[in-house]
Amino acid sequence: MTITIKSDNVTTGGTLGNVNGLKDQDYTLLLDFQNGEYTKKVGGVITNLTEADVLTCTSNKTLATKPMTMDRLGNKLYITKTDQTRWWQVKNAFGDFFGLLIESEQVNWFLNSATPITQTISNIPAGSTMVASCIGTGSITITGEGINPVTVTQDTPATITPQSLSTTISLTVTVTGTLSHVQVVRCAGFAGVHSPITTTTSRPTSGFDKVEINQALIAPLLAGTQQLTILIQSVPLQHTKDDRSQYNETRVVLETTALVAGLGLNKAANTNIGSRIVSTYKSDGSSHVSSGTVAISAQLNAPVTQVFSVGDFGFKGSVNGGNVYAVANATGLNNVTRIRLAEGVAAPSVMQGGNCVITKLAVFKKQLSDQEIKEFSKSWL
């Protein structure tokens, strides 16, 4: 007699013998935010960890703006502490994602956002590119001098790019139908929807998310490490079409005794993406290196897996299985003491902080060949 066993479950991103989706199992630290599973591997021994073991949160969110977090069932909850870790679920054409929510500080320029009525927004600073979004069954129509009129619904947020960027901006936002929230936010990094920022008759800043891998965890794991590779997957809440020629966001910030380096993602108006690195000297804040590329074809709102490899060879990166981008003079990133998640890097080598959901992250204490880097960056896709 022959017995056939069938399963209704379909595995993605790996085989049954490789259920975590990694292209290489020789990792030191694996943080699967999607499934809430965290492990370290020392001497071949795997140890399970908790969220408290792996993350340190020093966020400074403004509770008056009613910042939200989300559970794995998609339920939205208001946070109760300014330094609370936030989570978010994203469902789009590419899948169902869940992970750590990181957003930079923003202002919602639309007043009384939870009881929206038609209004004019004045004195938006020059040089602003904005994203308008709303929640509900109605819509908003945005008009103003120097912009192309646009109508926005819950499913169709839009980028607003003033034709003249040298003067302050005024917008008229006309509300139609039933809406529970309206938002007009200036872009920081990529053009995309920010989680809801509630306003009243004033518009306080949202505050920022600031999360890093627990230093007490990585200190013994990375002590004396000369070659380090970080693998990370991120997905946006919802990007909108953006005609700016090129822009960027961090995904990881590495810190050594001498340097702070932002490793992130470049994006172009044609939606091409690529690796980026900027780093500064801690002693005087001067630039160490600033370099990037946008050579990889990508689709708007698709998940992105990136490999960042640093060592005596400098920096090497790959995105979604694309060609390796190398920066030979980006040396000195040995003996990493901190790994911060999607935090901004200040002048002179600026990289905007990330606005994204980080679903997975893995750390490897070894140098990879170019072919391995390309293969690693196909993980979880």
Residue spans of the language-model regions?
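Extracellular polysaccharide-targeting segments
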Residues: T2-I117, T174-T225, T359-L381
